[in-house]
């Protein structure tokens, strides 16, 4: 059985070229290609049949030549603080999570780039699931499409790749997704309002830095020394802290360090001093993240006084820092929590919660 090409998997240039060739071969006017592409992203629809401005014969022809991926919404939860969490099922039954975070006049969509994650960070629910597969552009940017179709009046001001998965280990799909998110012919979100979060996958950082757009980079540091970071993040064996810091230094935009606060593990005064030194080395902004209160693998959240003292110690060393405000605590808004609950598995450990995202 022939699988039709999914128009949502192509970046804007490739999709418009493909549609243009298809239209020309059928004697259709050239403007039809942009018309169809606009209905995929700017005024999104779930099927060609909904493009009622097109002649019926053209809609039928498109449906016979291409497909449009649909994500099935299985769960939608809204927190008392306005945060919303969405669980989508894909064509093969895999589940992914998306979070919408309102904050004044800003609305941030936190999107997933993989089903599960291979990195097994000690405090992360997504890593505890294991890795299932990479997502396609249609499934990554498609999360934004789906939220736009669910609530057309709500337009995101910011996108963060801080959901399930490591985006820079799926660069083949994330790169065209960035184009779809940013290009004014598609979703048209400013590059400086799109943040890619990584544990420090060096080839991906280099590839991101090579792009001309001013996309933001956030690096999950979580420990200021190799010895401690290896115990929390096995990936540190492949990408040691010194190499990650060097890559951050070479990145031509200011980088954000993300640092989840683990009680008695990485929240002591000496850790603050070490972290401040790393941040100063590459002019990074530090975002401190209170550990989500769920989970049971030996980690406890740092106390509020400890977090405040930690932030004060970093600022005293000349480094800008912020403490992320916890959001969605009543709806399992930590990475992987909702998916784990729906699959009937016991959540082994808390993940980073999707609080207010501070990016320098």
UniProtKB/Swiss-Prot annotation:
Alphabetical UniProt keywords: 4Fe-4S, Cytoplasm, Disulfide bond, Iron, Iron-sulfur, Metal-binding, Methyltransferase, rRNA processing, S-adenosyl-L-methionine, Transferase, tRNA processing
Reactions catalysed according to its record: adenosine(2503) in 23S rRNA + 2 reduced [2Fe-2S]-[ferredoxin] + 2 S-adenosyl-L-methionine = 2-methyladenosine(2503) in 23S rRNA + 5'-deoxyadenosine + L-methionine + 2 oxidized [2Fe-2S]-[ferredoxin] + S-adenosyl-L-homocysteine; adenosine(37) in tRNA + 2 reduced [2Fe-2S]-[ferredoxin] + 2 S-adenosyl-L-methionine = 2-methyladenosine(37) in tRNA + 5'-deoxyadenosine + L-methionine + 2 oxidized [2Fe-2S]-[ferredoxin] + S-adenosyl-L-homocysteine
Residues that, per the record, bind [4Fe-4S] cluster: 117, 121, 124
HAMAP family for the chain: RNA_methyltr_RlmN
Major localisation: cytoplasm
InterPro entries to which the protein is assigned, alphabetical: Aldolase_TIM, Methyltransferase_A, RlmN_N, RNA_MTrfase_RlmN, rRNA_lsu_MTrfase_RlmN/Cfr, rSAM
Disulfide topology: 110-335
Name of the protein in question: Probable dual-specificity RNA methyltransferase RlmN
Pfam families linked to this entry: Radical_SAM, RlmN_N
Cellular component terms per the entry's GO annotation: cytoplasm
Organism listed in the record: Gemmatimonas aurantiaca (strain DSM 14586 / JCM 11422 / NBRC 100505 / T-27)
E.C. number: 2.1.1.192
Presence of keyword Transcription: no
CDD domains the UniProt entry points to: Radical_SAM
GO BP term, example: tRNA methylation
